[in-house]
Amino acid sequence: MAQGNEMHPRNPYRDKPPDFKALAIEYPEFRKFCQYVSNGKVTLDFRKDAAVRCLTQTLLKKDFSLNVNLPAGHLVPRVPQKLNYCLLIDDILQANSITSNVVGIDIGTGTSCIHALIGARHFGWKFVATDGDENSVQVAHENVARNEMGDSICVVHVNPAVKTVLMDVINSMPDSEFSFCMCNPPFFEKSDKEERFCEEPSLSNETYSNNFDFDMRSAPHSETIASSAELYVEGGEVAFVNRIIDDSVCLRDRIKFYTTMIGRKSSLKPLLQRLERFGENVKFLVHPLNQGKTKRWMLAWTFAKEMTLNTALKNSSISFQCPKPGLVKLMQEISRLGGRWSQEQPSVLVAEFKSVTWTNQRARRKANALLFENSAKRARWNTSSVACEAMMGNGDGKDSYTNSGNFVYSESFKTSDPAAVETSSQAYFPLPSGVTPRPIVKLRIQVDPDDKCDTLSFELISGAKQHLHQIVQYLKNLLCR
Protein backbone atom coordinates (compact mmCIF):
# COMPACT_ATOMS: atom_id res chain seq x y z
CA MET A 1 0.00 0.00 0.00
CA ALA A 2 2.35 2.71 -1.25
CA GLN A 3 1.86 6.16 0.15
CA GLY A 4 2.69 9.54 -1.41
CA ASN A 5 5.14 12.06 0.00
CA GLU A 6 2.44 14.72 -0.14
CA MET A 7 0.43 13.06 2.62
CA HIS A 8 -0.17 15.19 5.70
CA PRO A 9 2.80 15.22 8.12
CA ARG A 10 0.47 14.23 10.98
CA ASN A 11 -0.93 11.27 9.06
CA PRO A 12 0.48 8.11 10.72
CA TYR A 13 0.17 6.20 7.41
CA ARG A 14 2.67 8.57 5.77
CA ASP A 15 5.76 7.01 7.39
CA LYS A 16 4.24 3.72 8.53
CA PRO A 17 1.94 2.04 6.00
CA PRO A 18 -0.38 -0.69 7.28
CA ASP A 19 1.50 -3.86 8.24
CA PHE A 20 -0.49 -6.59 6.49
CA LYS A 21 1.39 -9.36 8.30
CA ALA A 22 0.58 -7.93 11.75
CA LEU A 23 -3.03 -7.29 10.75
CA ALA A 24 -3.39 -10.85 9.43
CA ILE A 25 -2.13 -12.27 12.73
CA GLU A 26 -4.46 -10.09 14.82
CA TYR A 27 -7.62 -10.24 12.66
CA PRO A 28 -8.66 -13.67 11.28
CA GLU A 29 -11.22 -12.15 8.87
CA PHE A 30 -8.50 -10.07 7.22
CA ARG A 31 -6.18 -13.09 7.10
CA LYS A 32 -8.53 -14.79 4.61
CA PHE A 33 -7.65 -12.23 1.92
CA CYS A 34 -3.86 -12.29 2.46
CA GLN A 35 -1.21 -14.46 0.88
CA TYR A 36 2.52 -15.01 1.35
CA VAL A 37 4.90 -14.22 -1.50
CA SER A 38 8.38 -15.63 -2.14
CA ASN A 39 10.22 -12.94 -0.14
CA GLY A 40 8.20 -13.74 2.98
CA LYS A 41 6.00 -10.66 2.81
CA VAL A 42 2.22 -10.69 3.10
CA THR A 43 0.28 -9.12 0.23
CA LEU A 44 -3.34 -8.20 -0.45
CA ASP A 45 -5.12 -8.48 -3.79
CA PHE A 46 -6.54 -4.98 -4.26
CA ARG A 47 -8.37 -6.12 -7.39
CA LYS A 48 -10.90 -7.87 -5.16
CA ASP A 49 -13.56 -5.58 -3.74
CA ALA A 50 -14.11 -7.83 -0.71
CA ALA A 51 -10.40 -7.62 0.19
CA VAL A 52 -10.36 -3.81 0.00
CA ARG A 53 -13.55 -3.65 2.06
CA CYS A 54 -12.07 -5.90 4.75
CA LEU A 55 -8.87 -3.80 4.85
CA THR A 56 -10.86 -0.61 5.46
CA GLN A 57 -12.93 -2.24 8.20
CA THR A 58 -9.79 -3.62 9.84
CA LEU A 59 -7.95 -0.27 9.82
CA LEU A 60 -10.98 1.53 11.25
CA LYS A 61 -11.23 -1.06 14.00
CA LYS A 62 -7.52 -1.11 14.89
CA ASP A 63 -6.59 2.58 14.53
CA PHE A 64 -9.87 4.32 15.44
CA SER A 65 -11.79 1.71 17.48
CA LEU A 66 -14.66 1.97 14.98
CA ASN A 67 -16.85 -1.00 14.07
CA VAL A 68 -18.22 -0.11 10.63
CA ASN A 69 -20.45 -2.11 8.29
CA LEU A 70 -19.56 -1.64 4.62
CA PRO A 71 -22.25 -3.40 2.57
CA ALA A 72 -21.32 -4.92 -0.78
CA GLY A 73 -22.35 -2.89 -3.80
CA HIS A 74 -21.26 0.45 -2.34
CA LEU A 75 -18.05 2.46 -2.51
CA VAL A 76 -15.31 1.41 -0.10
CA PRO A 77 -13.51 4.46 1.40
CA ARG A 78 -9.71 4.49 1.69
CA VAL A 79 -8.80 5.32 5.30
CA PRO A 80 -5.42 7.13 4.74
CA GLN A 81 -7.02 9.47 2.21
CA LYS A 82 -10.05 10.23 4.40
CA LEU A 83 -7.77 10.94 7.38
CA ASN A 84 -5.66 13.21 5.15
CA TYR A 85 -8.79 15.20 4.26
CA CYS A 86 -9.79 15.57 7.92
CA LEU A 87 -6.25 16.63 8.90
CA LEU A 88 -6.24 19.42 6.30
CA ILE A 89 -9.55 20.68 7.69
CA ASP A 90 -8.08 20.49 11.19
CA ASP A 91 -5.13 22.64 10.03
CA ILE A 92 -7.53 25.37 8.90
CA LEU A 93 -9.46 25.16 12.17
CA GLN A 94 -6.26 25.45 14.21
CA ALA A 95 -4.93 28.33 12.09
CA ASN A 96 -8.10 30.25 12.98
CA SER A 97 -8.13 29.17 16.67
CA ILE A 98 -11.38 27.22 16.21
CA THR A 99 -10.78 24.47 18.75
CA SER A 100 -14.12 24.04 20.53
CA ASN A 101 -17.74 23.55 19.45
CA VAL A 102 -16.62 22.46 15.99
CA VAL A 103 -19.62 21.42 13.89
CA GLY A 104 -19.25 20.16 10.32
CA ILE A 105 -21.59 19.13 7.53
CA ASP A 106 -20.71 15.99 5.57
CA ILE A 107 -22.43 16.17 2.17
CA GLY A 108 -23.17 12.71 0.73
CA THR A 109 -21.97 10.76 3.75
CA GLY A 110 -22.66 7.35 2.15
CA THR A 111 -23.15 4.05 3.92
CA SER A 112 -19.82 4.25 5.76
CA CYS A 113 -20.37 7.74 7.23
CA ILE A 114 -16.57 7.69 7.43
CA HIS A 115 -15.87 11.45 7.43
CA ALA A 116 -18.18 12.01 10.37
CA LEU A 117 -17.03 8.90 12.27
CA ILE A 118 -13.32 9.75 11.96
CA GLY A 119 -13.97 13.44 12.64
CA ALA A 120 -15.99 12.72 15.76
CA ARG A 121 -13.78 9.93 17.13
CA HIS A 122 -10.33 11.34 16.29
CA PHE A 123 -10.91 15.11 16.53
CA GLY A 124 -13.97 15.46 18.76
CA TRP A 125 -16.04 17.29 16.13
CA LYS A 126 -19.82 17.12 15.78
CA PHE A 127 -21.52 16.47 12.46
CA VAL A 128 -24.67 16.74 10.42
CA ALA A 129 -24.22 13.98 7.82
CA THR A 130 -26.54 14.15 4.78
CA ASP A 131 -27.34 11.79 1.92
CA GLY A 132 -30.00 11.54 -0.77
CA ASP A 133 -30.16 7.73 -0.82
CA GLU A 134 -32.51 6.24 1.78
CA ASN A 135 -30.61 2.94 2.00
CA SER A 136 -27.30 4.76 2.58
CA VAL A 137 -28.92 6.87 5.31
CA GLN A 138 -30.23 3.73 7.03
CA VAL A 139 -26.83 1.98 7.02
CA ALA A 140 -25.10 5.19 8.15
CA HIS A 141 -27.60 5.45 11.05
CA GLU A 142 -26.73 1.90 12.05
CA ASN A 143 -22.97 2.59 11.90
CA VAL A 144 -23.37 5.66 14.11
CA ALA A 145 -25.52 3.75 16.62
CA ARG A 146 -23.18 0.74 16.62
CA ASN A 147 -20.32 3.00 17.72
CA GLU A 148 -22.49 4.89 20.26
CA MET A 149 -21.88 8.25 18.58
CA GLY A 150 -25.47 9.45 18.27
CA ASP A 151 -24.71 12.48 20.46
CA SER A 152 -22.03 13.65 18.02
CA ILE A 153 -23.44 12.69 14.61
CA CYS A 154 -26.90 13.38 13.18
CA VAL A 155 -27.61 11.56 9.89
CA VAL A 156 -30.20 13.35 7.73
CA HIS A 157 -31.96 12.23 4.53
CA VAL A 158 -32.22 15.01 1.93
CA ASN A 159 -34.22 15.20 -1.28
CA PRO A 160 -31.83 14.36 -4.16
CA ALA A 161 -34.08 16.17 -6.66
CA VAL A 162 -33.52 19.55 -4.97
CA LYS A 163 -30.79 21.56 -6.68
CA THR A 164 -29.56 23.21 -3.47
CA VAL A 165 -27.11 21.15 -1.44
CA LEU A 166 -26.78 23.06 1.83
CA MET A 167 -29.65 25.55 1.98
CA ASP A 168 -32.34 23.20 3.32
CA VAL A 169 -30.07 21.79 6.04
CA ILE A 170 -28.93 25.23 7.21
CA ASN A 171 -32.44 26.69 7.13
CA SER A 172 -33.78 23.78 9.20
CA MET A 173 -31.25 24.65 11.93
CA PRO A 174 -31.40 28.47 12.14
CA ASP A 175 -29.75 28.64 15.58
CA SER A 176 -26.80 26.38 14.73
CA GLU A 177 -23.34 27.63 13.80
CA PHE A 178 -21.32 25.54 11.36
CA SER A 179 -17.54 25.52 11.16
CA PHE A 180 -17.10 23.80 7.79
CA CYS A 181 -18.61 21.48 5.21
CA MET A 182 -16.92 18.57 3.45
CA CYS A 183 -17.89 16.44 0.49
CA ASN A 184 -16.74 13.62 -1.76
CA PRO A 185 -18.95 14.21 -4.82
CA PRO A 186 -19.62 11.72 -7.64
CA PHE A 187 -16.81 12.23 -10.13
CA PHE A 188 -18.42 11.23 -13.39
CA GLU A 189 -21.11 12.23 -15.83
CA LYS A 190 -23.38 9.48 -17.12
CA SER A 191 -21.39 9.03 -20.34
CA ASP A 192 -18.15 8.63 -18.35
CA LYS A 193 -19.79 6.08 -16.06
CA GLU A 194 -20.95 4.00 -19.02
CA GLU A 195 -17.44 4.09 -20.51
CA ARG A 196 -15.54 3.17 -17.34
CA PHE A 197 -17.96 0.85 -15.52
CA CYS A 198 -20.23 -2.06 -16.32
CA GLU A 199 -23.17 -3.49 -14.40
CA GLU A 200 -22.20 -6.01 -11.74
CA PRO A 201 -24.47 -9.05 -12.28
CA SER A 202 -23.66 -10.63 -8.90
CA LEU A 203 -25.21 -7.69 -7.03
CA SER A 204 -28.46 -5.72 -7.19
CA ASN A 205 -29.51 -3.51 -10.08
CA GLU A 206 -27.87 -0.11 -10.46
CA THR A 207 -24.58 -1.50 -9.11
CA TYR A 208 -21.48 -1.07 -11.25
CA SER A 209 -17.89 -2.34 -11.35
CA ASN A 210 -14.71 -1.24 -13.11
CA ASN A 211 -13.49 -4.84 -13.24
CA PHE A 212 -13.93 -5.71 -16.92
CA ASP A 213 -11.80 -6.07 -20.06
CA PHE A 214 -10.05 -2.82 -20.99
CA ASP A 215 -9.09 -2.35 -24.60
CA MET A 216 -8.00 1.29 -24.66
CA ARG A 217 -6.36 1.74 -21.23
CA SER A 218 -4.62 -0.27 -18.53
CA ALA A 219 -6.67 -2.08 -15.91
CA PRO A 220 -7.28 -0.25 -12.61
CA HIS A 221 -5.01 -0.98 -9.65
CA SER A 222 -7.98 -1.86 -7.43
CA GLU A 223 -11.56 -2.90 -8.09
CA THR A 224 -14.29 -0.32 -7.54
CA ILE A 225 -17.89 -1.42 -7.01
CA ALA A 226 -20.45 1.29 -6.35
CA SER A 227 -24.07 2.22 -6.75
CA SER A 228 -25.15 4.42 -9.63
CA ALA A 229 -25.74 7.43 -7.35
CA GLU A 230 -22.20 7.15 -5.95
CA LEU A 231 -20.58 7.16 -9.39
CA TYR A 232 -22.22 9.86 -11.45
CA VAL A 233 -24.32 12.98 -11.26
CA GLU A 234 -25.73 15.17 -14.01
CA GLY A 235 -22.93 17.45 -15.16
CA GLY A 236 -20.28 15.51 -13.23
CA GLU A 237 -18.41 16.79 -10.20
CA VAL A 238 -18.01 20.28 -11.69
CA ALA A 239 -21.78 20.79 -11.75
CA PHE A 240 -22.19 19.32 -8.25
CA VAL A 241 -19.47 21.49 -6.70
CA ASN A 242 -20.91 24.51 -8.51
CA ARG A 243 -24.15 23.84 -6.64
CA ILE A 244 -22.21 24.00 -3.36
CA ILE A 245 -20.62 27.26 -4.51
CA ASP A 246 -24.09 28.61 -5.37
CA ASP A 247 -25.26 27.85 -1.83
CA SER A 248 -22.10 29.34 -0.33
CA VAL A 249 -22.76 32.64 -2.14
CA CYS A 250 -26.10 32.87 -0.33
CA LEU A 251 -24.96 31.46 3.00
CA ARG A 252 -21.63 33.31 3.16
CA ASP A 253 -20.23 32.98 6.70
CA ARG A 254 -23.14 30.90 8.02
CA ILE A 255 -20.50 28.23 7.35
CA LYS A 256 -17.02 29.52 8.17
CA PHE A 257 -15.34 27.71 5.30
CA TYR A 258 -16.38 25.28 2.56
CA THR A 259 -14.42 22.27 1.32
CA THR A 260 -14.83 19.46 -1.17
CA MET A 261 -12.74 16.68 -2.62
CA ILE A 262 -11.99 16.83 -6.35
CA GLY A 263 -11.39 13.58 -8.20
CA ARG A 264 -10.32 14.82 -11.63
CA LYS A 265 -7.61 17.39 -12.21
CA SER A 266 -9.48 18.76 -15.23
CA SER A 267 -12.29 19.83 -12.88
CA LEU A 268 -10.05 22.24 -10.97
CA LYS A 269 -9.69 24.84 -13.72
CA PRO A 270 -13.40 25.69 -14.24
CA LEU A 271 -14.05 25.66 -10.48
CA LEU A 272 -11.11 27.95 -9.72
CA GLN A 273 -12.17 30.27 -12.55
CA ARG A 274 -15.62 30.40 -10.97
CA LEU A 275 -14.22 31.35 -7.57
CA GLU A 276 -11.83 33.90 -9.11
CA ARG A 277 -14.82 35.81 -10.47
CA PHE A 278 -15.73 36.80 -6.92
CA GLY A 279 -12.47 38.74 -6.75
CA GLU A 280 -11.13 39.65 -3.34
CA ASN A 281 -14.43 38.74 -1.66
CA VAL A 282 -13.38 35.09 -1.49
CA LYS A 283 -10.23 33.24 -0.43
CA PHE A 284 -9.52 29.74 -1.71
CA LEU A 285 -6.82 27.08 -1.86
CA VAL A 286 -6.15 23.68 -3.44
CA HIS A 287 -4.16 20.89 -1.79
CA PRO A 288 -3.35 17.38 -3.05
CA LEU A 289 -4.72 14.31 -1.29
CA ASN A 290 -2.50 11.30 -1.99
CA GLN A 291 -3.39 7.70 -1.24
CA GLY A 292 -1.44 4.91 -2.84
CA LYS A 293 -1.39 5.43 -6.60
CA THR A 294 -4.54 7.56 -6.53
CA LYS A 295 -4.42 11.35 -6.40
CA ARG A 296 -7.25 13.61 -5.35
CA TRP A 297 -7.43 17.28 -4.37
CA MET A 298 -9.11 19.31 -1.66
CA LEU A 299 -10.67 22.61 -2.70
CA ALA A 300 -11.45 25.02 0.15
CA TRP A 301 -12.91 28.54 0.08
CA THR A 302 -14.34 31.12 2.47
CA PHE A 303 -16.19 34.44 2.33
CA ALA A 304 -15.26 35.32 5.92
CA LYS A 305 -12.69 38.14 5.84
CA GLU A 306 -11.16 37.15 9.18
CA MET A 307 -10.53 33.54 8.07
CA THR A 308 -7.15 32.29 6.83
CA LEU A 309 -6.83 29.10 4.79
CA ASN A 310 -3.47 27.83 5.99
CA THR A 311 -2.51 24.16 6.25
CA ALA A 312 0.56 22.26 7.40
CA LEU A 313 1.35 21.40 3.77
CA LYS A 314 3.54 24.15 2.36
CA ASN A 315 3.96 24.94 -1.31
CA SER A 316 7.47 24.27 -2.60
CA SER A 317 9.62 27.36 -3.13
CA ILE A 318 12.29 28.43 -5.64
CA SER A 319 15.40 30.24 -4.42
CA PHE A 320 18.42 32.08 -5.79
CA GLN A 321 21.14 34.36 -4.41
CA CYS A 322 21.71 37.95 -5.47
CA PRO A 323 24.01 40.83 -4.41
CA LYS A 324 22.91 43.08 -1.56
CA PRO A 325 20.59 44.87 -0.97
CA GLY A 326 18.24 42.22 -2.41
CA LEU A 327 15.08 43.47 -0.70
CA VAL A 328 15.41 47.04 -1.99
CA LYS A 329 16.16 45.93 -5.56
CA LEU A 330 13.30 43.45 -5.42
CA MET A 331 10.72 46.08 -4.41
CA GLN A 332 11.94 48.39 -7.19
CA GLU A 333 11.64 45.70 -9.86
CA ILE A 334 8.18 44.59 -8.74
CA SER A 335 6.96 48.19 -8.97
CA ARG A 336 8.64 48.65 -12.37
CA LEU A 337 6.77 45.58 -13.67
CA GLY A 338 3.46 47.08 -12.57
CA GLY A 339 3.03 44.76 -9.61
CA ARG A 340 1.95 45.61 -6.09
CA TRP A 341 3.80 44.51 -2.97
CA SER A 342 3.23 44.62 0.77
CA GLN A 343 5.44 43.58 3.67
CA GLU A 344 3.95 40.61 5.51
CA GLN A 345 6.98 40.62 7.82
CA PRO A 346 10.20 42.70 7.83
CA SER A 347 11.89 40.19 5.52
CA VAL A 348 8.81 38.77 3.75
CA LEU A 349 7.00 40.39 0.81
CA VAL A 350 3.69 39.46 -0.78
CA ALA A 351 3.63 40.52 -4.44
CA GLU A 352 0.78 40.36 -6.92
CA PHE A 353 0.46 41.06 -10.63
CA LYS A 354 -2.74 41.68 -12.59
CA SER A 355 -1.15 41.29 -16.01
CA VAL A 356 1.87 39.58 -17.56
CA THR A 357 4.55 42.26 -17.93
CA TRP A 358 7.75 40.23 -17.48
CA THR A 359 7.80 38.38 -20.82
CA ASN A 360 8.85 39.52 -24.32
CA GLN A 361 10.89 42.40 -22.91
CA ARG A 362 12.83 42.94 -26.14
CA ALA A 363 9.63 43.22 -28.19
CA ARG A 364 8.16 45.61 -25.63
CA ARG A 365 11.24 47.87 -25.77
CA LYS A 366 11.17 47.85 -29.56
CA ALA A 367 7.48 48.77 -29.63
CA ASN A 368 8.05 51.61 -27.17
CA ALA A 369 10.97 52.89 -29.24
CA LEU A 370 8.78 53.00 -32.35
CA LEU A 371 6.27 55.19 -30.55
CA PHE A 372 8.87 57.90 -29.98
CA GLU A 373 10.60 57.56 -33.34
CA ASN A 374 10.32 60.36 -35.89
CA SER A 375 7.21 59.57 -37.93
CA ALA A 376 9.05 60.31 -41.18
CA LYS A 377 11.55 57.52 -40.45
CA ARG A 378 9.03 54.88 -39.45
CA ALA A 379 8.63 51.81 -41.61
CA ARG A 380 5.53 51.84 -43.79
CA TRP A 381 3.38 48.74 -43.43
CA ASN A 382 0.71 47.48 -45.78
CA THR A 383 -2.58 49.24 -45.09
CA SER A 384 -5.14 47.28 -43.13
CA SER A 385 -8.44 48.32 -41.62
CA VAL A 386 -9.24 47.01 -38.15
CA ALA A 387 -12.22 48.04 -36.05
CA CYS A 388 -12.69 46.90 -32.48
CA GLU A 389 -15.48 47.78 -30.10
CA ALA A 390 -15.25 46.70 -26.45
CA MET A 391 -18.08 47.01 -23.95
CA MET A 392 -17.50 46.03 -20.33
CA GLY A 393 -20.90 45.36 -18.81
CA ASN A 394 -22.01 44.49 -15.31
CA GLY A 395 -24.07 41.34 -14.92
CA ASP A 396 -26.38 40.37 -12.10
CA GLY A 397 -23.54 38.69 -10.20
CA LYS A 398 -25.11 35.24 -10.52
CA ASP A 399 -23.21 32.49 -12.27
CA SER A 400 -24.92 29.66 -14.05
CA TYR A 401 -23.84 26.03 -13.74
CA THR A 402 -22.28 26.34 -17.18
CA ASN A 403 -20.97 29.18 -19.34
CA SER A 404 -24.45 29.83 -20.74
CA GLY A 405 -24.50 33.23 -19.00
CA ASN A 406 -21.61 34.37 -21.22
CA PHE A 407 -21.23 34.60 -24.96
CA VAL A 408 -18.58 35.09 -27.60
CA TYR A 409 -19.78 35.92 -31.12
CA SER A 410 -17.75 36.24 -34.31
CA GLU A 411 -18.92 36.88 -37.89
CA SER A 412 -17.07 37.34 -41.18
CA PHE A 413 -18.13 39.48 -44.17
CA LYS A 414 -16.91 39.46 -47.76
CA THR A 415 -15.53 42.71 -49.19
CA SER A 416 -14.99 44.05 -52.68
CA ASP A 417 -11.39 42.84 -52.46
CA PRO A 418 -11.43 39.02 -52.89
CA ALA A 419 -8.24 38.75 -50.81
CA ALA A 420 -9.68 40.65 -47.84
CA VAL A 421 -12.20 39.62 -45.20
CA GLU A 422 -13.89 41.88 -42.70
CA THR A 423 -14.45 40.29 -39.28
CA SER A 424 -16.68 41.40 -36.43
CA SER A 425 -16.17 39.87 -32.98
CA GLN A 426 -18.09 40.50 -29.78
CA ALA A 427 -17.70 39.05 -26.31
CA TYR A 428 -19.66 39.54 -23.11
CA PHE A 429 -18.54 38.27 -19.72
CA PRO A 430 -20.72 39.54 -16.87
CA LEU A 431 -18.73 40.81 -13.89
CA PRO A 432 -20.51 41.47 -10.59
CA SER A 433 -20.53 45.16 -9.75
CA GLY A 434 -18.13 46.21 -7.03
CA VAL A 435 -15.87 43.18 -7.53
CA THR A 436 -12.13 43.78 -7.84
CA PRO A 437 -10.53 41.40 -10.36
CA ARG A 438 -8.21 38.88 -8.72
CA PRO A 439 -4.50 39.13 -9.63
CA ILE A 440 -3.34 36.52 -12.12
CA VAL A 441 -0.43 35.57 -9.88
CA LYS A 442 0.37 36.14 -6.21
CA LEU A 443 3.72 35.31 -4.60
CA ARG A 444 5.29 35.22 -1.16
CA ILE A 445 8.97 36.23 -1.24
CA GLN A 446 11.30 35.71 1.70
CA VAL A 447 14.67 37.46 1.94
CA ASP A 448 17.39 35.74 3.98
CA PRO A 449 20.42 38.07 4.33
CA ASP A 450 23.99 36.83 4.51
CA ASP A 451 27.37 38.54 4.80
CA LYS A 452 27.97 38.81 1.06
CA CYS A 453 24.59 38.25 -0.58
CA ASP A 454 20.85 37.81 -0.03
CA THR A 455 18.86 34.63 -0.69
CA LEU A 456 15.43 35.20 -2.26
CA SER A 457 12.85 32.39 -1.88
CA PHE A 458 9.66 32.52 -3.97
CA GLU A 459 6.47 30.64 -3.00
CA LEU A 460 3.35 30.57 -5.19
CA ILE A 461 0.20 31.64 -3.31
CA SER A 462 -2.18 31.64 -6.27
CA GLY A 463 -1.94 31.58 -10.04
CA ALA A 464 -0.15 29.43 -12.60
CA LYS A 465 3.18 27.76 -11.82
CA GLN A 466 4.55 28.85 -15.19
CA HIS A 467 4.15 32.49 -14.12
CA LEU A 468 6.12 31.79 -10.94
CA HIS A 469 8.99 30.25 -12.93
CA GLN A 470 8.93 33.10 -15.49
CA ILE A 471 9.06 35.79 -12.79
CA VAL A 472 11.85 34.04 -10.88
CA GLN A 473 13.93 33.61 -14.05
CA TYR A 474 13.36 37.24 -15.07
CA LEU A 475 14.37 38.59 -11.64
CA LYS A 476 17.34 36.24 -11.44
CA ASN A 477 18.66 37.46 -14.80
CA LEU A 478 18.18 41.07 -13.75
CA LEU A 479 19.35 41.06 -10.14
CA CYS A 480 22.32 38.70 -10.50
CA ARG A 481 24.05 40.23 -13.51
Swiss-Prot record:
Catalytic reaction annotation: an adenosine in mRNA + S-adenosyl-L-methionine = an N(6)-methyladenosine in mRNA + S-adenosyl-L-homocysteine + H(+); adenosine in U6 snRNA + S-adenosyl-L-methionine = N(6)-methyladenosine in U6 snRNA + S-adenosyl-L-homocysteine + H(+)
Name of the molecule in the record: U6 small nuclear RNA (adenine-(43)-N(6))-methyltransferase
Quaternary structure and interacting proteins, as annotated: Self-associates. Interacts with dlc-1; the interaction is direct, and is required for nuclear localization of mett-10.
Catalytic EC class: transferase
Cysteine pairings via disulfide bonds: none
Residues reported in the UniProt entry to bind S-adenosyl-L-methionine: 82, 108, 131, 164, 184
Family annotation (SUPFAM superfamilies): S-adenosyl-L-methionine-dependent methyltransferases
Source organism per UniProt: Caenorhabditis briggsae
Keywords: Cell cycle, Cell division, Meiosis, Methyltransferase, Mitosis, Nucleus, S-adenosyl-L-methionine, Transferase
EC numbers on record: 2.1.1.346, 2.1.1.348
The UniProt record lists the keyword Zinc: no
Entry keyword annotation includes S-adenosyl-L-methionine: yes
Family: Belongs to the methyltransferase superfamily. METTL16/RlmF family.
